[in-house]
Amino acid sequence: MAWRSVGANNEDLIRQLKDHGVIASDAVAQAMKETDRKHYSPRNPYMDAPQPIGGGVTISAPHMHAFALEYLRDHLKPGARILDVGSGSGYLTACFYRYIKAKGVDADTRIVGIEHQAELVRRSKANLNTDDRSMLDSGQLLIVEGDGRKGYPPNAPYNAIHVGAAAPDTPTELINQLASGGRLIVPVGPDGGSQYMQQYDKDANGKVEMTRLMGVMYVPLTDLRS
């Protein structure tokens, strides 16, 4: 993509993403500045490209994390419930936490990262604690092990849901866990085929509207047996 680049450090990377119009809001830029990718990506943390993090999983490119924050930012408010499916390294989950915390403190806020690989769950918690132990200690950011394709009913309904891997078709179970006024963004399409980042918005009456945002290429949303 035209904006792909390598930052000298985390702040330089965020500056470049902002200069190229990938990051539009100061609040998104600040959340990403405060969440240094070096804690979450052992290889090339400031390169704008996916990087391996173990278990056959990659951390998404920084520009895709920026897009996710921009598309969801109006739903990231104190007291909101957020679900990050396929949370992997824990990076974007931490960005959600910091974005909301900067808006104000509310005891009802819950940001849940769900990951199906036990080792990645362990590693992401270690990443978060290396970054800032107070995030997990707050009880408002949770990392859980489970099949994210089924969402996480204990904290539903969610004001915002992000999915970090491609669903083969419309993710009905996740849509069912959206709150009224909530938004889901998810890559949809077959592995190796045409995929699109799709946005699902649920209105006050439960009606869902889908908007196709852009063409993407993601690994498929799976479980350990896939």
Swiss-Prot record:
One of its GO terms (molecular function) is protein-L-isoaspartate (D-aspartate) O-methyltransferase activity. Belongs to the methyltransferase superfamily. L-isoaspartyl/D-aspartyl protein methyltransferase family. CDD domains: AdoMet_MTases. The lineage of its organism: Eukaryota, Metazoa, Ecdysozoa, Arthropoda, Hexapoda. The active site is at 60. It comes from Drosophila melanogaster. Its EC number is 2.1.1.77. This is Protein-L-isoaspartate(D-aspartate) O-methyltransferase. Keywords: Cytoplasm, Methyltransferase, S-adenosyl-L-methionine, Transferase. PROSITE patterns: PCMT. Gene3D superfamilies: Vaccinia Virus protein VP39. One of its GO terms (biological process) is methylation. Initiates the repair of damaged proteins by catalyzing methyl esterification of L-isoaspartyl and D-aspartyl residues produced by spontaneous isomerization and racemization of L-aspartyl and L-asparaginyl residues in aging peptides and proteins. It catalyses: [protein]-L-isoaspartate + S-adenosyl-L-methionine = [protein]-L-isoaspartate alpha-methyl ester + S-adenosyl-L-homocysteine.
